[in-house]
C-alpha cells in the first residue's frame, strides 16, 4: 500500500478541520511554532543519517518520511497547497542556475 503526498495533504487538511481528540496531526497543526520545530528536528536527523559512512536505507526512509510529513503539515498550516510547491518546482525545471 502506498500513500501519495496529495492524499497525505488531504488527511492533514481533514485533521485540521475536524481536530479529533488525541490526533497528533491535529495537535501539531494547532501550533505553527511546534510544526517549525519538528521540521527542523526531523531535517537535522535526516541530514545526520545521510552523512553516515554506511547509509542505513531504512533509517533514511524513516527520517525522510518524517521530513515529508512535517513539511506537508507546515504547508497545510500556512495555507499553501502542495500544488503551489509542485508548480514552483516545474517552473524551475530547465531554468538556468544563478551564479
Where are these regions (language model features)?
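Flexible "arm" and connector segments at domain edges
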Residues: 1-64, 68-99
Amino acid at each position: 500500500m502506498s500513500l501519495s503526498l496529495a492524499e497525505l495533504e488531504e488527511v492533514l487538511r481533514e485533521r485540521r478541520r475536524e481536530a479529533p481528540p488525541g490526533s497528533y496531526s491535529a495537535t501539531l497543526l494547532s501550533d505553527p511554532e511546534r510544526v517549525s520545530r519538528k521540521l527542523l528536528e526531523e531535517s537535522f536527523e535526516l541530514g545526520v543519517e545521510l552523512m553516515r559512512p554506511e547509509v542505513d536505507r531504512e533509517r533514511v526512509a524513516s527520517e525522510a518520511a518524517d521530513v515529508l510529513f512535517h513539511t506537508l503539515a507546515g504547508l497545510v498550516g500556512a495555507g499553501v497547497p502542495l500544488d503551489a510547491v509542485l508548480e514552483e518546482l516545474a517552473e524551475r525545471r530547465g531554468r538556468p542556475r544563478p551564479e
